Amino acid sequence: MSGADILEKTTRGATFLMMGQLFSKIVTFLLNNTLVRYLSPRIFGITAFLEFIVGTVLFFSREAIRLSTQRIADGNDADNDHDHDRDDSALQVCVNFAMIPLFIGIPLSIGLIAWQYHNINGYFVTLPFFQWSVFAIWVGIILELVNEPLFVLNQHFLNYGARSRYESIAVTANCLVNFTVVYSYEKKLILTSYFDDSERFREGIAILAFALGKLAYAATLLMCYYYNYLMNFKSNKPFKLSLQKIKSKVNEKQTYYFRSDILEHFKKVYFQLCFKHLLTEGDKLIINTFCTVEEQGIYSLLSNYGSLITRLLFAPIEESLRLLLAVLLSKKDSKNLQLSMKVLVNLTKFYLYLSLLVMIFGPNNSSYLLQFLIGSKWSTNSVLHAIRVYCVYIPFLSFNGIFEAFLASVATGDQILRHSYFMMMCSFAFLINSWIFIEYLDLSVNGLIISNIINMSLRIIYSFSFIVKFYRELHTESSIFMNFTNFKATLGAAALVAILNWQMVGYVSSFNGFITSATLALILLSVILIKERATLNELIINRRAANMKSV
């Protein structure tokens, strides 16, 4: 597969992932807004806690494998004239590595659930069906890990379309089961003689509905991927869905289960992800330690709304970029290097322009939009000020995502290890900064956001330095700083629009002010599109050519 073909598939894949995320968020939003009429806040709290357990087990079981298997290229130890054998060997390597999450996840899930079960408030433990709910959660985790070999195979073939479809179907199944159980109980549609109307029974049913929804999600996902396997792989029997010894093409007497280079990479990535997870979840630990319950609610609100743009836009782009670079730069020829740099530069420019729009129009419009979305009860000064500061944080989040995605895709084991040590230092810096800003300077939620900005800045500097060094060492003719002249020219127009925005509107408090600010945003967007019209025309032409080729 050529570099252009890989780029076309990953670009289309990013679109599929965004559409899948959008569908999932809409369905989940509708479900939550329906169920909130029937459930108490503490039930949402315990389900969020169970969700955290599921996410933690799955993250530590499979995330490092998903990143490591992206580096499995066809035929690393094969001759060039044995394409079919080479493909089969690579597929079995993928399957073997995808069995590791199950070996990690079974003991990890049992240990974590057993530990947390004893720490859960006794009230929840005595609720009806609670033990069955926990068991259903555990079975759902195991089913997701059983599905991992099929997921990794689709990832190997850049099959984003299937993934987006299957995850959307699974999310729908989750929501339908969850809603059906709660609604059936509330309307007394089933087993009315067995159920009672007590609040405890209602809460037990709600937790059971959540657990059965998770189980339905995992089972549906597994069935979809297995159907894909039956349709596309089983008849050819190129590999087995179990741990198998693989013969080395260099020496047929030698066999292995796991390729040594990928295994070493997995170990170092796993070590790094532990610190990355600490930084990702660290803000929750900090705010629970230093902030009041009201402040925790404010930050939870900001995180939930702020994560929408992260999950809908940034996350699909980062995942597609990781896979693109891992495949594209498995062979560092000049053509692939130039293509990878071009993709990175275009993405960086896109994020720069997006950051301009967010930084100029986010702080003065966000508080008005937030009040419009969730009502006036959140209209305290602390909330309105915090959402403005959070808008400044979003660009740092975006750049860190793509730069660390690049590093994760091309870094050697030793470079990943050094990055892990750097992440450890960032963790300590984050803790110290949070204490200073929250406790000493009394900045509350704003202090936590500022600490996150400093943390992201350090990580961006490290990753960007790695990228510049990477291309310099490979003696590429172009510079990573190329083609940013249009952005520099746009900065002048952006500064003028920003001044007009603050002079004419300031902090938006009415619909007329919002329309004026939106008009200025459209003017700046038009300037950006005009300045970058050559790049946009090139992308459109390439997309049309790819579509004609696929017809």
Swiss-Prot record:
Q: Give a Pfam family name.
A: Rft-1
Q: Which GO terms describe its molecular function?
A: flippase activity
Any single GO CC term annotated in Swiss-Prot or TrEMBL for this entry: endoplasmic reticulum membrane
Indicate whether Ribonucleoprotein appears among the record's keywords: no
Membrane topology reported for the UniProt record:
Multi-pass membrane protein
Which InterPro entries does the record cross-reference, listed alphabetically? RFT1
Write out the transmembrane intervals: 16-36, 40-60, 95-115, 123-143, 168-185, 204-224, 343-363, 391-411, 421-441, 448-468, 489-509, 510-530
KW Transmembrane helix (keyword) present: yes
- Entry keyword set: Endoplasmic reticulum, Membrane, Sugar transport, Transmembrane, Transmembrane helix, Transport
Lineage: superkingdom: Eukaryota
Question: What does this gene product do?
Answer: Intramembrane glycolipid transporter that operates in the biosynthetic pathway of dolichol-linked oligosaccharides, the glycan precursors employed in protein asparagine (N)-glycosylation. The sequential addition of sugars to dolichol pyrophosphate produces dolichol-linked oligosaccharides containing fourteen sugars, including two GlcNAcs, nine mannoses and three glucoses. Once assembled, the oligosaccharide is transferred from the lipid to nascent proteins by oligosaccharyltransferases.
Report the sequence similarity comment from the record.
Answer: Belongs to the RFT1 family.
Designated name of the protein: Man(5)GlcNAc(2)-PP-dolichol translocation protein RFT1
Lineage, please? Answer: Eukaryota, Fungi, Dikarya, Ascomycota, Saccharomycotina
Q: Which gene encodes it?
A: RFT1
